[in-house]
Amino acid sequence: MQRLLSGSLTICALALALPAAAQVEYPPVPVEKAAYHWPVFSNEHVMVLRVYFPPGRGSNYHIHSLDQISVQVEPGANAGQVWGEEPTPARPGTKGQVSFTAYSKKKFIHKSTNTAATPYQNIVIALLKPKPAGLAPAARPDGYVQVFDNERARGWKLALEPGQSVGPITQSAPGLRVVIDGGEIAEIVSGQPDRGLGLRLGDFYWQEPGTTRGIRNIGTTRIEIAEFELK
């Protein structure tokens, strides 16, 4: 009987210890090493991460230390916790939200978990150069809505209904396009045949400077994209 009681007490002690062991936190990692943060592209200018949290999933503690552009393409609802602080409650994201954060001036350490029944997806563009390279983005015509302009980059959003088009722009600095709502477009370059493109939510494209192009929605659904040029 005494041996049975002793064994039962040991099992209870182990059961109580398991939750504590499960909550052990490892040291923060660089953002590109965090769970559900996948590096998908890099060059001398940028590192692009696809952050994708299925429902109920999230990241471990990680460090943001590079200036960063973010585009939310699937909003989810993330609960977060800053390193050394109390957790913050979940709040729904906003599809299409574009943001810029100067993490090079003050690094940020946190973790987050998607509490929604739908996925969370964020395209993160980390700027690898520590300061501007002296590039100069040009102004864009009506249709492009500027969403930010600072010492590191300039950003716009463009939405087109089926059949709508936007006048040509000449891209004067390197940058990216991120797809918020997919569909079909034609890129129009003078002297060349129109180039049809199928856009998918969360797709991104690196774009070199020097091209003059217009865009027309040739599909049956509204498209929305964000475009950025570096400085």
Predicted features and spans:
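Bacterial N-terminal signal peptides that target proteins for export
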Residues: 1-9
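Bacterial N-terminal signal peptides
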Residues: 8-19
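Ligand-binding loop in jelly-roll beta-barrel domains
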Residues: 104-128, 182, 208-231
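Short acidic-glycine-tyrosine-enriched beta hairpin
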Residues: 84-104, 193-209
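Surface-exposed beta-loop interaction hotspot
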Residues: 103, 111-161
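A short glycine-rich, His/Asp/Glu-containing loop-to-beta-strand
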Residues: 33-61, 65-73, 139-177, 227-228
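Glycine- and acidic-residue-biased ligand/ion/polar-headgroup-sensing regions
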Residues: 65-84, 171-191
